């Protein structure tokens, strides 16, 4: 997977909530740090669930991160020599994140992005599908369905324990109190 490239590349880690996306991003970042590579990690300002200045996985692993409001701010922070640029919760960025990641890869960086591939309705969650298309490596992770234990590819949003409706707002930052991993069979989105 980590062949030597003369230019940079993009790695996209995706899947449903609770599938281990942030955990995998943190693992790859730590491997880079162990190899004495220079790493910088970014997260969107909207993601304030666990920490404003860290990427934190659901099981508590964390790595220091720069909090940004707009994808263009990433380019402003990447001024010194870095080897790895990691971006978590990429689905919360504007669609310009695709161009930012592409530009960084073309400048020779290893770019790792992690985010949801589908929203709570089971609809592709832009800009992640486009990032998947331009990535050299795509890792799609699955969680375990909270109803039956089957592999989970969907994220179920719950409002007071009841499935959210299709026309509810797409973005609602939350964790276990609002979302569950579900398989295709047990994913419910009332119209």
UniProtKB/Swiss-Prot annotation:
It is found in: Cytoplasm. The active site is at residue 89. Pfam families: TK. It comes from the Bacteria. GO terms for cellular component: cytosol. It catalyses: thymidine + ATP = dTMP + ADP + H(+). The keyword Ubl conjugation does not apply. Its EC number is 2.7.1.21. One of its GO terms (biological process) is thymidine metabolic process. Zn(2+) binds at residues 145, 148, 183, 186. Keywords: ATP-binding, Cytoplasm, DNA synthesis, Kinase, Metal-binding, Nucleotide-binding, Transferase, Zinc. ATP binds at residues 15-22, 88-91. GO terms for molecular function: ATP binding; thymidine kinase activity; zinc ion binding. PANTHER family: THYMIDINE KINASE (PTHR11441), THYMIDINE KINASE, CYTOSOLIC (PTHR11441:SF0). Homotetramer. Belongs to the thymidine kinase family. This is Thymidine kinase. It comes from Macrococcus caseolyticus (strain JCSC5402) (Macrococcoides caseolyticum). The lineage of its organism: Bacteria, Bacillati, Bacillota, Bacilli, Bacillales.
């Amino acid at each position: 997977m980590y062949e030597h490239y003369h230019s940079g590349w993009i790695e996209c880690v995706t899947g449903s909530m609770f599938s281990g996306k942030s955990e995998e991003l943190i693992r790859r970042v730590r491997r880079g740090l162990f190899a004495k590579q220079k790493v910088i990690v970014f997260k969107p300002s909207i993601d304030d669930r666990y920490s404003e200045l860290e990427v934190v996985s659901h099981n508590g692993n964390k790595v220091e991160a720069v909090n940004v409001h707009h994808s263009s701010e990433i380019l402003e922070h990447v001024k010194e020599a870095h080897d790895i640029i990691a971006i978590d919760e990429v689905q919360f960025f504007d669609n310009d994140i695709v161009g930012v990641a592409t530009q960084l890869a073309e400048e020779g960086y290893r770019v790792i992005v992690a985010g949801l591939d589908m929203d709570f309705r089971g609809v592709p969650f832009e800009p992640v599908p486009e990032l998947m298309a331009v990535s050299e490596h795509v890792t799609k992770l699955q969680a375990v369905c909270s109803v039956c234990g089957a592999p989970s590819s969907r994220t179920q949003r719950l409002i007071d324990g009841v499935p959210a409706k299709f026309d509810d707002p797409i973005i609602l930052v939350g964790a276990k109190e609002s979302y569950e991993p579900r398989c295709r069979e047990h994913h419910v989105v009332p119209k």
